[in-house]
């Protein structure tokens, strides 16, 4: 019996990724890192800044996301996000640029506690990539 399921990641520009041989996905949900396997209970969750890890027979792929929504239903995982990058395609200059921007946003005196939390999460993740 196959232990694979389908994932589709969509951003505003295009269908970013569609894969049918996925064996596990780990997403940075607000509730914490969430591992999803075939036949997982149906879920809908918000994403926080972090790394989506996709495992398949061909290996592991990692993607940086800043936000989004994840839905798993009937062995189909859908991710809607406004910003996603394949980690192997991000150069150090882009990471530094995103980190500088996040650190500047963090210093804004008008930032809400919720936005401060998200910016701090983004900074932590970007520092691990840098």
Swiss-Prot record:
It holds the Pfam family ATP-synt_DE_N. It comes from the Bacteria. It is found in: Cell inner membrane. GO terms for cellular component: plasma membrane; proton-transporting ATP synthase complex. Keywords: ATP synthesis, Cell inner membrane, Cell membrane, CF(1), Hydrogen ion transport, Ion transport, Membrane, Transport. Transmembrane segments: none annotated. It is a peripheral membrane protein. One of its GO terms (molecular function) is ATP binding. F-type ATPases have 2 components, CF(1) - the catalytic core - and CF(0) - the membrane proton channel. CF(1) has five subunits: alpha(3), beta(3), gamma(1), delta(1), epsilon(1). CF(0) has three main subunits: a, b and c. Produces ATP from ADP in the presence of a proton gradient across the membrane. Belongs to the ATPase epsilon chain family. This is ATP synthase epsilon chain. It comes from Pelagibacter ubique (strain HTCC1062). The gene is atpC.
